[in-house]
């Protein structure tokens, strides 16, 4: 994902990272583009195919984005479908998750995957409460549209690697 000042060079880097990581998750690909509104493009295709789609070009490339979240899914719980592809949006939370939970987070939302239960749980009761319930592996990136914040959380069982651009204006 990227958060901050996203120019053409960084957008190209985001697409390259998404494409290079597609071997880690071949069941579906998705991108959330967050600027003045949230646009999510996802499908049961490889990253290269999603990046070539008219929907991606219209909803992602044509907008000025503050945050880009990308994900390639390897299905562990829940069927392979467009709805079960990441990113997820529940209320103010836009989220991607790497890992597997042994049981879903308790939530009022109707969810089909462990990842979507994390998203709904954070939206309903906050990340601290969700993390107390966490049973499994989880690294989560999420954007809170109400607070305008980008958040990274991990229980250490899945990798979380990040860096800043040289000008310190963008988190990668």
Regions found by a protein language model. Name each.
Residues 1-172:
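Conserved short alpha-helical segments that host acidic/polar catalytic motifs at enzyme active sites
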């Amino acid at each position: 994902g990227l958060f901050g000042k996203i120019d053409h060079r960084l957008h190209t880097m985001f697409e390259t990272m998404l494409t290079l990581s597609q071997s880690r998750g071949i069941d579906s690909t998705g991108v959330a583009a967050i600027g003045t509104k949230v646009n999510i493009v996802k499908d049961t295709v490889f990253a290269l195919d999603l990046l070539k789609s008219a929907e991606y070009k219209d909803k992602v490339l044509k907008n000025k984005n503050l945050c880009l979240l990308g994900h390639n899914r390897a299905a562990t719980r829940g069927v392979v479908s467009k709805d079960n592809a990441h990113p997820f949006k529940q209320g103010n939370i836009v989220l991607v998750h790497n890992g597997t939970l042994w049981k879903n987070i308790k939530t009022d939302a109707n969810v089909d995957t462990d990842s979507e239960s994390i998203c709904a749980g954070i939206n309903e009761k906050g990340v601290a409460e969700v993390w107390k319930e966490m049973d499994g592996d989880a690294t989560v990136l999420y954007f809170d549209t109400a607070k305008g914040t980008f958040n990274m959380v991990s229980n250490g069982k899945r990798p979380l690697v990040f860096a800043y651009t040289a000008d310190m204006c963008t988190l990668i």
